[in-house]
Amino acid sequence: MTDQEEAKLILDKLNEKIRYHDLLYYTQDSPEISDAEYDDLCHQRSIILEKFPSLNSYYQDYIGGDPDSRFSKVKHNERMLSLDNAFNKQDVEKFMVRTRKLLDMKENESLCFSCELKIDGLSFSIIYKNGKLFQASTRGNGYFGENITNNVKTIENLPHTIQNAPDFLEVRGEVYIDRNDFIQLNNEGKNFANPRNAAAGSIRQLDPTITAQRKLKYCMYTIVNSNCLTQTESLNLLNSWGFCTNEHTISTDNFEEAINFYNKMYNNRSNISYDIDGIIYKINNIKLQHILGTTSKSPRWAIAYKFPAIEGKTKLNKISIQVGRTGVLTPIAELAPINIGGVVITRASLHNKSEIERKDIREGDYVIVKRAGDVIPQVVDVDKSLRTVELAEFNFPTACPACGSTVYQAQQEVSIYCMGGLFCHNQILEKIRHFVSKDAFNIIGLGKKQLLFFYEYGLITNIIDIFTLEEKINNKNIQLSSFNGWGEKSINNLLSAINNSKVINLENFIFSLGIRFVGKHIAKILANHFISYKNWYTEMLKLAQDVNYTINIQQVGLKTINSLRTFFTEQHNLNMINNLVEHLTIIDAQSNSYVSLIHGKTIVFTGELSSMSRSEAKLKSETAGAKVSSSLSKNTDFLIIGNNPGSKYKKAQSLNIQILSEDIWLQYIQPNKV
């Protein structure tokens, strides 16, 4: 058998696999493999075709899947093509070099590209006749799509009529669903694997009233046979007709700028409300697009630079249980290492007992793991086709694995809790970790490893111990420097960080207590409402002492109020707070309707202040709206001087920076009502 004959056999098998997965993905909206695995199959096929070009005559390019027979077929006036993929910077560079060569461009000629988000949704086309929506269809196999006209009409903000449009107009775009709406949809009893499947399944409903309930969104990206000169002009025209287009779009003739846009959107994708899986580069000049034309599958003038995979398949070796600071028992998947998006994943969240039962997850299974942005990796599905032997169902523990206490499940909750409370060392350690975290007391140098060390030696067993640590070390005559990892500098830095943390704003203080349902956002709302620690504490006591008493604050719901009431009903919590505040200076919050004379200014301190510590002065200044810097520059607005100012004083004079005494600064930070 020749190499080419062998390659043809491999190609036939690859084509069969790809067609099978196309059917599942495009028509049935129930893929069995991840996008990365599918892309790998297509990549293997392209390598063979590149090595044996004559095999192209045996290979028919398919796009998507055949239309769903439940819907009437629609023949596309212009084929709806898919895009070639790039998987690294070099692939993009090759594409840009190739297009310049095909266009016979000189080295000094610029070629502008439109850089757009590749939204992970379902492609669709709409035809307008005489300004009225006439017909909408899916991509289907590129030649024929499914008629989804009535369903598309239910999408919010999609124009049914257009002013000043040509008699015949075809526009194309993407239907998608926001991640939060997808989560809500599944919480209501649906079982979609991901937002893309949810959008595709929703637009293919036989009953348009169901589609209307699904909160679908859309984004238009092209006008078929446009008279516009550029892609940028096309997008502007779509906007003028009332269509939604994507705001995250740039045009550039600079390769590095195009790559920087990719990197920026990749790093920022978790802050976008919908899923994106890459960047599309299109030649901006539409005349040049026509010159380049298309292959049987894709345009020669565009390419999709895919993001690294956020999903992958690996073996679940073991399910372990993690006990958090609120006592919640969280199941964790211990995985065979897998590289997802450049990060090696060995553990992932399984959420709760109900999720394990619903997905029928068992130790030894092969599972789909998803990682999105900074979100904790999670197991989203199980590949049961690889469960070749009978695996035992997972039994959730009836006792806390950390302390042995009984566990319980509250009514109407999926979480299971340890009843050990302060007896459970896992809860204590997690509570302390939360207390010292960045958005709470922000004590640098007290990480998980250090806390465990101090806990085991009985130096920090509760949060009060943090502020008496130096005293305990001295009383017990413990030489920290004799332990591995504890040098004189690290000890001094830690004790200094603890001392500096004793000045804290009200918002961070409330958050540090770890009260259930009181996250950073709610803590800020409470601080801004009550302004001072005294006001807040007094109201919390009223809440605890009178079951009929309540607080009316926008965005603070009954669940949060009941949690605050429960927390302040416990005497040990009151004792802890009262002991804690003896070590602290809690800075009042400033009402949102107040500003100060240093609001928005950059300030620097030098010398020793007589009225407070430097850390307290920094916090007061930041509370008043100033940015506090450690070094002078031409952007510094004020230098505040105390006793024995350093060299910054002379430098400020040479830079003509305004100098304030401590007394004047104290006046400047007072709130002025606006």
UniProtKB/Swiss-Prot annotation:
SMART domains: BRCT, LIGANc. The active site is at K118 (n6-amp-lysine intermediate). It comes from the Bacteria. The keyword DNA repair applies. Keywords: DNA damage, DNA repair, DNA replication, Ligase, Magnesium, Manganese, Metal-binding, NAD, Zinc. The keyword Signal does not apply. Its EC number is 6.5.1.2. This is DNA ligase. The gene is ligA.
